[in-house]
From Swiss-Prot:
It is found in: Nucleus; Cytoplasm, Cytoskeleton, Spindle pole. The keyword tRNA processing does not apply. Keywords: Cell cycle, Cytoplasm, Cytoskeleton, DNA replication, Nucleus. InterPro entries: Sld7, Sld7_C, Sld7_N. One of its GO terms (biological process) is regulation of DNA-templated DNA replication initiation. Its main location: nucleus. This is Mitochondrial morphogenesis protein SLD7. It holds the Pfam family Sld7_C. Belongs to the SLD7 family. The gene is SLD7.
Length: 279
């Protein structure tokens, strides 16, 4: 990792301004070994709060291949508390507008806006390069102009670089988002179906055990309307389920299809004989 910038960020109003200090931005690429010349390129910036944004609703062009994703570190407890609190809201991002502290600072290739957001326990930062959007807008404008003036240019001979640029920047992101959404939907659907099936099997086992217990009680001449018999029924059912707890776990995990009827019948008979032998 390599340190690329130090920021001082202003929050609050003009009359009640507060500055977050020691906001360090680090690049996480593997090519982070610095030589003596690179160490001098770390710049200092001052910034101001702009707005909160929903990370999920950011335009696709913001996180394309040309955007630099950084990690934020700090030694300031105040700065740490600020980001921990403000980024505690799910999917929230914080936008800051930043400018160099010195006029001589090399600002080429740097973005004017930084979006801070939380990814698990790490605060990450995306540098927003507005020139990308301006370039895309210009290219779209050129395409619309060409389509609206077919006499000035052949629509079939549109500049291939325009299409290639838009496709490479947008289609790859769109395909990735669609694919991820499909995978998440399939995973949720599969999980719900699996849960429904396991619950259904568990209910079937409980129903079978209940019927076996009631049949066993009738064979012993015990009336199901008496409170003592009902208590015996509940105790036997709980004990039967406990006896087959490992089988029920295997059912829920899908490792076995069903518990053999004979095994459940034997369990119920054994328990009823045990509970009624002194009756």
């Amino acid at each position: 990792m390599s340190l690329v910038a130090n920021l001082k960020l202003s929050i609050g109003s003009k009359n009640n301004e507060f500055v977050l200090r020691d906001v360090q931005l680090w690049e996480t690429s593997d090519t982070s070994i610095l030589d003596a010349g690179q160490l001098k390129r770390v710049q200092s910036y001052k910034g101001r709060f702009v707005a909160y944004v929903d990370i999920k609703k950011l335009p696709l062009w913001i996180k394309n291949q040309q955007s630099r994703e950084l990690q934020c570190f700090t030694r300031s407890s105040t700065t740490l508390r600020y980001f921990s609190t403000k980024l505690g809201v799910k999917q929230r991002g914080i936008v800051f507008e930043c400018i160099p502290l010195t006029e001589k600072a090399d600002n080429q290739g740097c973005c004017s806006y930084y979006i801070f957001y939380r990814n698990e326990n790490v605060v990450k930062v995306v540098q927003v390069d507005l020139s990308i959007k301006a370039n895309i807008d210009l290219q779209i404008k050129q395409i619309k102009s060409t389509l609206s003036n077919p006499q000035q240019a052949d629509v079939k001979k549109l500049d291939s670089t325009v299409s290639a640029t838009i496709d490479s920047r947008l289609n790859s992101d769109i395909t990735k988002i669609v694919s991820e959404n499909i995978e998440r939907h399939e995973h949720r659907t599969s999980k719900v179906l699996k849960s429904m099936l396991s619950n259904d099997k568990k209910i079937q086992v409980r129903d079978t055990l209940s019927k076996l217990i009631l049949a066993g009680l009738r064979l012993r001449g015990l009336s199901s309307t008496k409170s003592e018999t009902q208590k015996l029924f509940r105790i036997t059912l709980s004990a039967s389920e406990f006896a087959h707890r490992k089988d029920l776990i295997q059912l829920q995990r899908g490792h076995t299809k069903a518990i053999p009827f004979e095994e459940m019948q034997e369990t119920v008979e054994t328990l009823l004989n045990l509970f009624t032998r002194n009756g």
